[in-house]
């Protein structure tokens, strides 16, 4: 990790929004279009389920994908700016939501955002959304990833401006907010622990446990056979 200063905390007040504004109802549904391709969907779901599995004992975060973030009553006019492909909010209640409504969430914005680039969204993700997340959301960490070209970049918010994250020797980028690395494996963006271990999905974890149980059973059978060769009944041990 090459970092000289910790990323800033996300905005946690509504100081940028006039107190005279009457906010619309908080029961707002997400207004996001379907994801562009099957690969985009796979990538978003992978980020969500891997983190939820890793943090399955935690109740103080919210991780979701392709969900609208309502931060201003005037926002609906900005049709060119959609919700993030994936974002994480820390220090909040882990529960199902129809959308993320900032003024109903104690002014909290995402701690981390990941955008999955595509030919139709890349320019917006690199420019308009980057500026939005930097200047309005003040999100401490912003990453983007192109599942086709494998372009991968990350930024820390330092002194109000996004600064590039330097990769480690494996090309992985460190997220201080998550306490994890992000890196590419077989064309997909994955999490890694601070020691470099891949964070598994629930399915991968179950498969590993099955394989480990099978190996233990095989080892036990070999040991039992060896004991019988020595005229020792393994059931009596």
Model feature map: region roles:
Residues 2-32, 36, 53, 71-84, ...:
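C-terminal interaction segment
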Residues 41-54:
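A structured, charge-rich N-terminal accessory region that forms the first stable segment of a protein
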Residues 43, 59-61, 84-85, 110:
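A generic secondary-structure signal marking the coil-to-beta-strand transition
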Residues 57-72:
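A short acidic/basic microdomain associated with nuclease active sites
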Residues 62-64, 143-146:
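A structural signal for short, well-ordered beta-strand segments and their strand-loop junctions
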Residues 140:
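Short acidic/polar active-site loop segments enriched in Thr and Asp
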């Amino acid at each position: 990790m090459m970092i000289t200063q910790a990323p800033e905390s996300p905005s946690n007040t509504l100081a940028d929004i006039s107190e005279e504004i009457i906010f619309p109802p908080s029961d707002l549904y997400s207004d996001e279009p379907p994801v562009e391709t099957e690969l985009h969907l796979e990538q978003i779901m992978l980020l969500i389920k891997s983190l939820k599995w890793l943090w399955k004992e935690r109740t103080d975060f919210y991780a979701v994908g392709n969900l609208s973030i309502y931060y201003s009553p005037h926002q609906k006019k900005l049709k060119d700016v959609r919700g993030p492909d994936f974002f994480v909010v820390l220090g909040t209640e882990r529960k199902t939501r129809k959308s993320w409504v900032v003024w109903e969430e104690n002014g909290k914005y995402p701690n981390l955002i990941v955008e999955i680039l595509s030919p139709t969204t890349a320019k917006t993700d690199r420019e308009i959304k980057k500026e939005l997340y930097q200047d309005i959301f003040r999100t401490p960490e912003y990453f983007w990833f192109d599942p086709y070209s494998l372009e991968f970049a990350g930024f820390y918010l330092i002194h109000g401006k996004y600064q590039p994250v330097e990769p480690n020797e494996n090309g992985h980028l460190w997220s201080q907010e998550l306490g994890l690395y992000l890196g590419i494996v077989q064309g997909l963006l994955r999490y890694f622990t601070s020691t470099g271990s891949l964070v598994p999905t629930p399915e991968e974890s179950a498969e590993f446990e099955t394989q480990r149980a099978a190996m233990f059973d095989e080892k036990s059978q070999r040991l039992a056979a060896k004991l019988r060769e020595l005229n020792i009944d393994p059931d009596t041990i």
